[in-house]
Amino acid sequence: MRTRFAILAAALFASAAGAASPTYSVSDFTRVRKFDAHVHANMDVLSFLTVAKNDGFELLSINVDYPDFPDLKTQADVTQKLQAADPKRFHFATTFSMQGFGAPGWTERTNAAIDAAIAEGALAVKVWKNIGMVAKNSSGHLIFLDDPGFDDVMAHIQSKHLPLIAHQAEPKNCWLPLEQMTTENDRSYFKDHPEYHMFLHPDQPSYESLIAARNRFVARHRGLQVVGAHLGSLEWSVDELAKYLDTYPNATVDLAARMTQVQYQSVRDYAKVQAFFVKYQDRILYGSDLTQNPPSASERAQNPPITGAEFPAEADKFWRSDWAYLATNKSQRVDAISADVPGLALPRSVIDKIYYANARRVFFNGR
């Protein structure tokens, strides 16, 4: 019953909004220029670039110090080859290793590695959730993002006019038992990644403490543009996201791998979610988290990578589904939340920012 009312309300709301603000259609998908600001292209093949070209996307492939991915050098080599193949369409973000953090020379080595990546074309630097959840200092204590040991590196990144992409904490579902999680994609991920399922590790940092450390970091580095990967791990509440964006003018967020959490909310309060996207249209970047990784029997990536001949079709399907939700009023079944989800039908001017202009502003600094 709730879904039926949501669909009716969405149709009425979209109709009223559409009278004043033109929207895109499903058929507009390939002709509108777009930028996926969060992918992982870890294979030296051209299929990702091919489907991106066909669908009208530029890509930002993000290197991550993630044990399920190839090592950092291999990731860097692949992204540089793909950038050379299509420099106008393919871009990349670098990262750094936490190995040796706090020891003499770590800051200098890290800054030198960042400079080398910039020389190769890096547009941003990524920090991952191992900061705060895995990496420890020489005393055996977890290292949080607001640790002063990062300050000189962050100042260096800021001096180079690069943004920092920060994946901190996890979806709030991570601190719930599996049966209480709101989306099936979170449930399956944490079932397969028990080491990151914080409900099973009450001795580990709380969700609130990780978010607080991230917020202190963003406040301390006001001159650094901080892109909150995965909706800044505030995916569960557009109200909390609004508070975060209001408090920190240097913050933006990407949508990567969190669309179902947004859809979970829009099924319950369509008008609120639509209004959030309109109000914060300059602060939200489209990202998918699509991952093309070498096949591995032990692979357990958050978005299971799609390899081989099926990748272009699956990527195209994923992108079109997101487009239908954000840009049109089309309703589609979303199994991850067991609901029929009407599209938000955001105005064209809003879509153009979320899908392209914001990424160009943040990552190219006006270039």
Positions of PLM-derived features:
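Positively charged n-region of N-terminal signal peptides that target proteins for export
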Residues: 1-4
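Bacterial N-terminal signal peptides
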Residues: 6-16
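An N-terminally biased module of ancient metal coordination in phosphate/nucleic-acid-related enzymes
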Residues: 19-89, 108-109
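Active-site gating/metal-coordination segments in enzymes
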Residues: 22-27, 77-203, 252, 259
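Hydrophobic faces of well-ordered beta-strands that scaffold small-molecule active sites
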Residues: 35-39, 59-62, 90-95, 125-127, ...
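Acidic-and-aromatic substrate-binding clefts and catalytic sites of carbohydrate-active enzymes
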Residues: 38-46, 65-75, 99-108, 135, ...
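Helix C-cap/helix->beta junction micro-motif
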Residues: 86, 159-160, 221-222, 247-248, ...
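H/E-rich (His + Asp/Glu) clusters that bind or coordinate divalent metals
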Residues: 202, 206-216, 225-367
